[in-house]
Amino acid sequence: MSSNDEKHAVAIIGSGNIGTDLMVKILRHGKHLKMGAFVGIDPESDGLKRAERMGVPTVTTGIDGLLAHPDFGSIRYVFDATSAGAHARHEQLLRPHGVRVIDLTPAAIGPFVVPAVNIDQHLDSPNVNMVTCGGQATIPMVAAVSRVVPVEYAEIVASISSRSAGPGTRANIDEFTETTSNAIVQVGGAKAGKAIIVLNPAEPPLIMRDTVYCLVPGDASQSAIVESVEQMVDSVRTYVPGYRLKQAVQFDEFKGRMPQELATVRAPRLKVSVFLEVEGAGHYLPSYAGNLDIMTSAALATAERIAARQPVTA
């Protein structure tokens, strides 16, 4: 699609780093989506000022201002890039209007969606949750392993640049770990999971790096796991080009202490280690902010997939 008349109008709530980067992505690369409104609460924020310069309608009074906006009736999709706490209220206010909500906070009111893994299962959901940046990066790897061999336990460590972690990210650290841990099980397919986030203060800033550990049966096919992981990397790269393996998948006999969830397991186990890095596309944010880029890219891919199935006049 090329004409704006043939695209669905969307609103973005949250004028911080994630919301602004998502706006730029939609303006540059939206196939079925166009910007209808950019919503914040600080008129002096860089995001709102940038939206004005780019000709995007702006709202400076938050969700209440969006609902009162004369063009709200044309909005078909709303991206929420605020916080987990704020999203609960936003969802209640938006639900009666029948708009589709793509939640980029850890609120997890709707089902978890990782585009490369389970988007087709939730195309009709009124509210979908994009998990977390660490979840978007690592859960595809857990799913890649679990689709060829049982994963009894998965643990992920997401290391992001401190400079890329804004106030919203820092305020949601607890929600990050809980939401990501739940999604490792619900979407990744592990029997138990744990998530850890590290804010790396290094200067110059380093790009996002993630480590995924999976405990699998000792007789698991290593070649099948490697093939599945490589295929999944290719799938994620269709919407996050900077997503890549940092080195080959590693296999080691697990001789350490079993996680509490597996304390009764005595059979030999194999530890699968996957090392990733995510480089941002640099649309609005620096390339080291791959953690933010993968969230906005996944959200856009999800909304585009949903919108492709719906007529614009619906």
Curated annotation (Swiss-Prot):
One of its GO terms (molecular function) is acetaldehyde dehydrogenase (acetylating) activity. The keyword Lipid metabolism does not apply. NAD(+) binds at residues 15-18, 164-172, 291. GO terms for biological process: catabolic process. Keywords: Aromatic hydrocarbons catabolism, NAD, Oxidoreductase. The active site is at residue 133. It catalyses: acetaldehyde + NAD(+) + CoA = acetyl-CoA + NADH + H(+). Its EC number is 1.2.1.10. It holds the Pfam family AcetDehyd-dimer. It comes from the Bacteria. Signal peptide: none annotated. Coiled coil: none annotated. CDD domains: ALDH_C (cd23933). Belongs to the acetaldehyde dehydrogenase family. This is Acetaldehyde dehydrogenase 1.
